[in-house]
């Protein structure tokens, strides 16, 4: 009998739904999925294919003078494909008026309405569910967008790194007015719940060093959501692996009995039992607000979420040897964290130009560059 190669520790380029459909047919099972989908309506990553047309050198750009590069020179130097990343309105959407070519694009986030974007996201996660273990979990970090009458503004890419900025999306749905916060994270969470997922928790990613914003009629955005969902009511979750240290004051209170704590059914008055009063608790269940600095990674596009952010997801959602999936692998952060903790990984990515960066990061022990407040990414335009 011919020996088959295990489908693990690989990243496939192309449409993630087609890839996951193939994996499902091959019997692939993953224990957890940790991912950060594209922001809605903020970036065209240049993955479109143009068919036909009378000029093979045409870039299909409406106004070249408005083309903007990312501010990370190291990235621009090492990743020429992303150097061409532009805000969506600079490209012709369907047919190029310069050369007559028609556009075919598999990227998500460029839909005409938020509802269409959510519909596509739900479909992606149906494919995730097909290869997720019955006791598996899904962790989604997703950012929001603002509606506006202007063109899409800079937000430095996919969810996970940048902050929501004003003048963002001119693709709006029913009832959405200019300057409205669209509510993409909760639209997605509720849609996934409606589609059969168990919506278990909203986790707040608090950013102590948020990217500044130039708006003057609201507060600077300094958080994003991570949603924890499960396939079934009962699922694998190793809370012990992500316990956090208990503050000295709390330990003292527990030991002295000055706090309240339910030990078992025999102590319904919530007082500590005599036995538990003498126990010093060194840790507690992890809270749902995670303070993690925005952290650049030299050579990556801005949307790399910090490895410290998803480390608890990997540890709580899987065991050593399990497979961790990311259908929007990008620069390879999820794979790097999985490998660091003796997990296997599977990933999908539409843009093949990420290949060399992914390989570099998976091999690297670097958890990101030190936070430098003078970095250009922390300066608003």
Residues covered by each model-derived region:
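S-adenosyl-L-methionine-dependent nucleic acid methyltransferase catalytic domains
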Residues: 1-381
């Amino acid at each position: 009998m011919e020996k088959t190669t295990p489908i693990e520790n690989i990243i496939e380029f192309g449409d993630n739904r087609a890839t996951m459909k193939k994996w499902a047919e091959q019997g692939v099972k993953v224990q957890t999925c940790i991912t950060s989908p594209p922001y809605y309506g903020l970036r065209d990553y240049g993955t479109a294919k143009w068919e036909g047309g009378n000029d093979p050198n045409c870039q299909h750009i409406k106004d070249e003078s408005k083309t903007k590069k990312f501010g990370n020179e190291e990235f621009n130097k090492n990743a020429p494909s992303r150097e061409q990343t532009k805000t969506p309105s600079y490209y012709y959407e369907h047919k190029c008026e310069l050369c007559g070519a028609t556009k075919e694009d598999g990227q998500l986030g460029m839909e005409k309405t938020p509802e269409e974007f959510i519909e596509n996201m739900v479909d992606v996660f149906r494919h995730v569910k097909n290869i997720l273990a019955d006791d598996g979990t899904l962790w989604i970090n997703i950012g929001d967008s603002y509606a506006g009458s202007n063109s899409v503004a800079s937000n430095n890419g996919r969810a996970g790194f940048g902050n929501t900025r004003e003048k963002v999306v001119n693709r709006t749905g029913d009832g959405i007015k200019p300057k409205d916060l669209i509510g993409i994270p909760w639209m997605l969470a509720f849609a996934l719940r409606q589609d059969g997922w168990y919506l278990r928790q909203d986790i707040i990613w608090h950013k102590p060093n948020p990217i500044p914003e130039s708006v003057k009629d609201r507060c600077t955005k300094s958080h994003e959501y991570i949603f924890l969902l499960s396939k079934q009511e009962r699922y694998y979750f190793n809370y012990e692996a992500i316990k956090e240290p208990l503050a000295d004051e709390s330990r003292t209170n527990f030991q002295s009995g000055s706090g309240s704590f339910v030990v078992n059914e025999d102590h319904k008055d919530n007082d500590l039992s005599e036995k538990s009063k003498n126990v010093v608790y060194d840790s507690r269940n992890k809270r749902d607000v995670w303070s993690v600095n925005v952290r650049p990674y030299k050579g990556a596009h801005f949307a790399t979420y910090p490895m410290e952010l998803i480390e608890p997801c990997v540890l709580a959602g899987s065991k050593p040897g399990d497979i961790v999936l990311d259908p929007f692998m990008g620069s390879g952060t999820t794979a790097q964290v999985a490998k660091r903790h003796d997990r296997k990984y599977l990933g999908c990515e539409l843009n093949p130009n990420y290949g060399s960066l992914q390989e570099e990061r998976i091999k690297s022990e670097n958890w990101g560059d030190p936070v430098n407040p003078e970095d250009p990414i922390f300066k608003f335009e």
